[in-house]
Amino acid sequence: MAVQQNKKSPSKRGMHRSHDFLTAAPLAVEPSTGEVHLRHHISPNGYYRGKKVVKTKND
């Protein structure tokens, strides 16, 4: 059975647990289309910050 060699202090225990809780992804709303997408990514329609930057299949 595995046994720890040294006791982990409360501070180190907290640092170890600090990444256990997930946060919601930061979402942004495209001003021209109203579509929701990840921040700093283009929307599925090819818009970024209100401007068309990528041609899509429908264009």
Curated annotation (Swiss-Prot):
Keywords: Ribonucleoprotein, Ribosomal protein. The keyword Ribonucleoprotein applies. SUPFAM superfamilies: Zn-binding ribosomal proteins (SSF57829). It comes from the Bacteria. One of its GO terms (molecular function) is structural constituent of ribosome. Residues 1-23 are annotated as: Disordered. Coiled coil: none annotated. The keyword Transcription does not apply. Pfam families: Ribosomal_L32p (PF01783). One of its GO terms (cellular component) is large ribosomal subunit. GO terms for biological process: translation. Belongs to the bacterial ribosomal protein bL32 family. This is Large ribosomal subunit protein bL32. It comes from Burkholderia multivorans (strain ATCC 17616 / 249). The lineage of its organism: Bacteria, Pseudomonadati, Pseudomonadota, Betaproteobacteria, Burkholderiales. The gene is rpmF.
